[in-house]
Amino acid sequence: PATQVITDEMARAAANVTGANRLLIGLGWSLVILIYWLKRREKLDLRGEMNLEISMLIIATAIMGLIVVFQQVSIILAVVLIGVYLAYLWISSTGESEEPELIGVALVIGSLPVARRRATVVLMFLYAAAVILLAAEPFVHGLVETGAEFGIDEFILIQWIAPLASESPEIIIAVLFTLRSNPQAGLTTLVSSEVNQLTLLVGSITVVFSISAGEVMSFPLDDRQSIEFLLTAAVSAFAIILIAPRVLGARVGLVLLGLFIVHLFFSDPGQRLIFSYIYFGLAIFLIVVDRGRIRQLIPRRL
C-alpha cells in the first residue's frame, strides 16, 4: 500500500466510513440509552436481545483489525465482509420476527396489494438512489470549498459533516422509537446499521474502487487512514464490551457520549492513535474487572 498513491477521493471515502461508524456509536447509541433513562429513570434491559447483531458486529470489528494490519481493504477481505453482510441478511430473514405496527405512510404502503406495494418500495429506493447520485458530488465539493475558506482540514470535515447528514435519519428514527417506549427497536436499528456499515459499506469501497480502475485491486490506506480504521475498531470493540451485560444505565450512555465528544477535539493522527489505545485499554479493563462480559457475548441462540 505504501507504494500506491492515495488520492483525495480515496482519503475522503476512508474519512466518511470511519466517521459514520463512530457517529452511530458515540452519538446514536448514547442518545437512545440516555433518552430512555431520562424518560423512565430506569436502566434499559436488553437481555436476550440483539444476539445476532452483536455477533456480526464482533466479526466485523475483528476484520477491521486485519484491515489495519495489512493497511488495505484487500479484495479478499472485501468479499468476506460482503459475505458476512449477506449471511446476516439471510439469518435475520429466516429467524423469528414480530409483525411491526405500521403508522402513517408505512401503513398506507403496507395496505397496498402485494404487486403495487413492491413496485412502490422499488420506486422509492430508485428515487432515493437518484437523489444521492445527483447531490453527493456537489455536496462534497461544497464541503471541501467551505473547509478551504475557513481553514478546516477537509479530512475532518468529510469525516463528520457528511456522516452527520447521512446517518441523522437513522439516529432520528431510533430516538423516535425510544420516545414511543420502544428503545429495544431503537438501539437494534443502530446496531444493525453499524453492522451494515462495517461489512457492506467497507467491502463495497474495494469493489467500486476495482470497477473504477478496470481491474481487481485492493483499496490502500495511508498511515492516517490506518489510524482512523484502528480507532473505529477500538471504539466498536469498547462499545461491544461495554453493552455486553445488556442492562444499560445512564452511566453507559454518558461514557459513550463523553468519549466521543472529547476525541473530536483531537484530530492529529498521533492523538487519534493514543485514543485508540485508550479505547482498547478501557475494553481490557472492563474484561479484567468483570470476566463475565465475555461469556455474556456468547449467544445461546441467534
Task: For each feature predicted by the language model, list its residue ranges.
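Hydrophobic alpha-helical segments, chiefly the membrane-spanning helices
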Residues: P1-L302
